Amino acid sequence: MVKSPKIKILNIISGSKYGGAELFFERLALSFERCNKIEQKIIIRNNRNRSKKFIDGIDEIEKINFFHKLNPFCTFKIEKIIREYKPNILLSWMNRASSVIPNIKINNEITVGRLGGYYKIKNYTKCDYLITNTSDLKKYVISKGWDTNKVEFIPNFVSQNKIDKIKSKINKDRIILCMGRFHPNKAIDILIKAMPFLPKFRLFIVGEGELKSQYEILIKKFDLMSRVKIFEWSDNISEFLNKCSILVCPSRHEPFGNIVIEGWAHKIPVVVSDVGGPGRIVKHKTTGIKFEKDNTFDLVSKIKNLNSDKKLKRKIVINAYNVYKKSYSEEVIVSHYLSFFRRIIKSCAE
């Protein structure tokens, strides 16, 4: 039997220093590198931390300092790499990377844009296909005029390789964990305002962003300094997940919510707002608990009820972990990417 040739992927991201899409790009790129059915080259904005993560895991890396469509060197370098590397698939992440890819085909590469939010579709006019990480995003893209046959929904995965099965004894201290960017969309302020009504709990907030000083003001205002701690973002999120008893995602807007899947994989019960990705993927009292967006008192009530109902908590943890294994594991998602790439390569060759 003749083996199928490897799929050659040129994987491109500009990306911020931190973020959910950036974190998943790193995971997926490393997974592609481990897959014996894929050959890969990546192009990233020059970022010391990202480069450090890839130094032992990815062989072919190109870096661009100023990742912008108005930078002629950026477009020229990408065109040169395509011409020399001859990829089957050019996978561009988010707005910036998708806007700087060439206007014309260089080696009959198939261009696939990857969206993780409700971005402006005009940035993806050079793409042949799109991948969204939620079914709602797929509907959004199609509503903007995209052919349903050219939009694929593939969710994110989380890796289990850093998950420590041995929980810390600190679990007994009733620690609530919240992780993410310090941005209005994340609604971390709602969780801080809930803490005066949850006197038996401590809160760990992990992240970075523009609202840190405002959170610190709220913490002092409600005299929560001894129970609420802010930590800088860490790539080893298992360190925090293994210390908490409940994970809360209070977002006002959240396209997917990687952290929810992280909680499932770590066997931590999750409490989420009833919006966006978390509101869609979590089944109330089955794989998590949902509360009304921006409703502090509903959040307090749901946390108290979950904590007091040990049977419900066990049920949620077991169900959520099973969903993670079935639908959000690395093996399942990488296989989906592979089958999608094979399908569109075959379709474009006919």
Residue ranges and their predicted role:
Residues D298, N305, L312-S327, I333-S339:
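A short, well-ordered alpha-helix in the C-terminal region of glycosyltransferases
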Residues H284-K285, I289-T296, N305-K310:
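Conserved acidic donor-binding segment of nucleotide-sugar-dependent glycosyltransferases
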Residues P269-V272, V282:
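Short hydrophobic beta-strand element within catalytic cores of glycosyltransferases
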Residues G19-L30, R174, C178-F197, E210-E216, ...:
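A conserved mid-protein helix/loop that constitutes part of the nucleotide-sugar donor-binding site
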Residues L70-C74, S92-S98, L115:
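Short His-centered aromatic/hydrophobic patch
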Residues W233, R252:
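Aromatic "clamp/platform" in nucleotide-sugar-dependent glycosyltransferases that forms part
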Residues D136, F157:
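Carbohydrate-associated surface elements
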Residues N11-C74, K150-F153, E210:
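N-terminal strand-loop element at the rim of the active site
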